[in-house]
């Protein structure tokens, strides 16, 4: 199994990989979907506080790689060992280490400034996003407490998403092509 991990702070542009993945016929598994599913399963409203608290509780109960385990189990059940699979939303170095024990893994970090990310999240209208700056900052702090900063700093590739969307997609696609070609 060849995994491509996508990391970045909320609103950085991680989900853009989904459109490229379709083009290259690569499956995307979202770690955030695992957390949102668990939040809903508990009967909680999908909002930044509940989703964030669920992520924290899952890691407290099942270890710091708690979100990576069901993602990898799903991938192993559904896909051929020769397939590329993208794991979107890696947040901790523990998740990276867990995935690397079980598969070849390259990490792409997507970076955007806090202001750019806040503007995007404010307009995205997803249940677990907020248009309140203080809630945004709290979410960033929670993400940083998961050690996402370490994952970003130690990533294999970095794509900056500050300007034109088409330029970002072009850079992201070139990075994806380089990973596929290197294999």
Swiss-Prot record:
Covalent S-S links between cysteines: none
Stretch forming the signal peptide: none
UniProt binding sites for ATP: 8-15
Keyword annotations of the record: ATP-binding, Nucleotide-binding
Any one Gene Ontology molecular-function term assigned to this protein's record: ATP binding
Protein's UniProt keywords contain Nucleotide-binding: yes
Pfam families in UniProt: AAA_17 (PF13207)
SUPFAM superfamilies per the UniProt record, alphabetical: P-loop containing nucleoside triphosphate hydrolases (SSF52540)
Family: Belongs to the UPF0200 family.
PANTHER family membership: DEPHOSPHO-COA KINASE (PTHR41930:SF1), UPF0200 PROTEIN MJ1399 (PTHR41930)
Protein name (record): UPF0200 protein MmarC7_0527
Organism (species): Methanococcus maripaludis (strain C7 / ATCC BAA-1331)
């Amino acid at each position: 199994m060849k995994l491509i991990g996508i990391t970045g702070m909320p609103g950085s542009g991680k989900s853009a990989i989904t459109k490229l993945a379709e083009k290259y016929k690569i499956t995307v598994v979202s770690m955030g979907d695992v957390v949102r599913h668990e939040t809903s399963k508990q009967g909680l409203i999908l909002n930044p506080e509940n989703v964030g608290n669920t992520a924290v509780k899952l890691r407290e109960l099942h270890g710091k790689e708690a979100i990576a385990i069901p993602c990898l189990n799903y991938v192993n059940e559904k896909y051929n060992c020769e397939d590329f699979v993208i794991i979107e939303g890696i947040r901790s170095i523990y998740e990276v280490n867990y995935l690397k024990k079980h598969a070849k893994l390259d990490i792409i970090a997507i970076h955007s400034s806090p202001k750019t990310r806040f503007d995007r999240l404010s307009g995205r209208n997803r249940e677990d996003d907020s248009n309140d700056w203080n809630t945004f900052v709290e979410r960033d702090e929670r993400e940083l407490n998961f050690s996402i900063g370490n994952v970003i700093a130690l990533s294999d590739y970095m794509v900056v998403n500050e300007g034109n969307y088409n330029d970002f997609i072009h850079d992201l696609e070139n990075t994806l092509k380089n990973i596929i070609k290197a294999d």
